[in-house]
Amino acid sequence: MAKDDKKKALDIALKKIEKDFGKGAVMRMGEKVDTQISTIPSGSLALDAALGVGGYPRGRIIEVYGPESSGKTTVALHAVAEVQKRGGTAAYIDAENAMDPAYAEALGVDIDSLILSQPNTGEEGLQIADTLIASGAIDILVVDSVAALVPRAEIDGDMGDSHVGLQARLMSQALRKLSGNISKTKTIAVFINQIREKVGVMFGNPETTPGGRALKFYSTIRLEVRRAEQIKQGSDVIGNRVKLKVVKNKVAPPFKVAEVDIMYGKGISQTGELIDMAADKDIIKKAGSWYSYGDDRIGQGRENAKQYLEEHPDVYEEVKEKVREAYGIDAKAIEERENPEKVKQDKEVPVNKDASDEKK
């Protein structure tokens, strides 16, 4: 077949595919408009830096897993709050029936506009998730948690009945269906998962996550959340130091670690992580126990430095901008990814001819 005939045959095939399956079903990579990864901030500056792209990528699956009470739900709720701040719509599939509206509100979540579902079975929860995602109206959907998505057969059966691999099959089937809609609608799907231990493992890591291997494969990002140490005020425990490890990342280099303070009743301490990140880049100087910014001493000890930044929002914003720049979490770069057309229009604003003539 001649080269021109091949080109014509390919064009006919492409047109037929578009007619049968809709525009965008197939395209040349050079024609694809959305070559940049569009993201939404995670609610933690340290985590945004660790993720490598400034936040959670749109149209992708994120798995957040870890031991009990490590801060998994807190991490997910911060992402929900960030989406809502930007005018987006969030949905929450509460399979554990453990949603605390007061705590979510303290983290900045708009409870009134949050779409909440508490399904009775795993099939029901995943069907609701698929319907919401397919609508194209949801920006972020959280499933809390995969371990609580119990198959109907297990709920209807008797205690002690064996249902080997039932939940894994359910997740595998659901993710095959969900992944396409998630990508098309640019929805961020966050699956919270628990940790289990394999019986009889002598060597290697005995820990695993429920729901089979499908979620591991389909996830663009896998976040491991673990408590590092307690945060105390005198003898009272007021929070936990938490490590967020990016175990898998398809959009940037993996294995980066972010450390954050999760305070009881308040969530991630954004001021605390800002001080740590600024100190690492010498934006805030640390000499002994004293913290200094510019020529000013801002506090003796980390807690006093945090208090200073909380009381001086102008200094806080100034330090934040410098930290974003130092770590490559540039707000302008994110805007270019989010609104490339708007940025292009701003760049193409015509110069006032009279003003330019006067300069000459």
From Swiss-Prot:
Ordered alphabetically, the record's keywords are:
ATP-binding, Cytoplasm, DNA damage, DNA recombination, DNA repair, DNA-binding, Nucleotide-binding, SOS response
Q: What are the start and end residues of every segment in region (Disordered)?
A: 330-360
State whether keyword Transmembrane applies: no
Instruction: Give the matching Gene3D superfamilies.
Output: P-loop containing nucleotide triphosphate hydrolases (3.40.50.300)
GO CC, one annotated term: cytosol
Highest taxon, organism lineage: Bacteria
Q: Where in the cell is it found?
A: Cytoplasm
A GO molecular-function annotation = damaged DNA binding
A GO BP term here is: DNA repair
Task: Summarize where ATP binds, as residue positions.
Answer: 66-73
Main localization, broad class: cytoplasm
Instruction: Name the InterPro entries for this protein.
Output: AAA+_ATPase, DNA_recomb/repair_RecA, DNA_recomb/repair_RecA_CS, P-loop_NTPase, RecA-like_C, RecA-like_N, RecA_ATP-bd, RecA_C_sf
Q: Does the keyword Nucleotide-binding apply?
A: yes
Alphabetized Pfam families for the sequence: RecA, RecA_C
Give the PANTHER family listed for this entry: MITOCHONDRIAL DNA REPAIR PROTEIN RECA HOMOLOG-RELATED, RECA
Summarize the protein's role: Can catalyze the hydrolysis of ATP in the presence of single-stranded DNA, the ATP-dependent uptake of single-stranded DNA by duplex DNA, and the ATP-dependent hybridization of homologous single-stranded DNAs. It interacts with LexA causing its activation and leading to its autocatalytic cleavage.
Homology family: Belongs to the RecA family.
Query: What's the name of the protein?
Result: Protein RecA
